C-alpha cells in the first residue's frame, strides 16, 4: 500500500511539474551579480539593476516575442555594459563591469502567483567585479521584474509546493 502511494505521489509530482512548465511561454531573464556581500556592493547591484531595467524597457519593450527580445539584447549587450559602467563610475566604483548574453542556470523563483521553475534560460547577465556576492534576477520577457523592497526587507519567505497546488486544484482548495 505504501509503495502504491509513493508511486502515485511521484507520478503526481512529475505530471504537475511538467504541466506547470508547459504553461510558461519562452522567457528571457536578467541576472545581476554583485561583487561581494558588503552593503556597498549590494547597493551598487540594485543601482545597476535599475539601469538594466530602464535600458531593457527601451530595448525590448515592444518585442513581439521572446526570440525577438533576446536578439535585441544580444544586439545591445555592449550598450547595457556601457550604461552600467557609467553609472558605477558615477557612484565611485572603479572595478570591472561585464555584460553578456547566453544560457544560464536559474533556481526556482516565485513572482507573485507565477512559479518560474529552475532551469537553463536565455538571459542578460551583468557581473560586477568578481561576481561573488548575492545576485538579483527577474524575467525581462514577458516582464515579471517586480521590485518590492518592502517584501524584501521583511525577510518573509513564501514556500510553494507543486504537489500541494495540484491537490488544491483537484480537491477545490480544502487544504
Where are these regions (language model features)?
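Soluble extracytoplasmic domains of inner/organellar membrane proteins
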Residues: 114-166
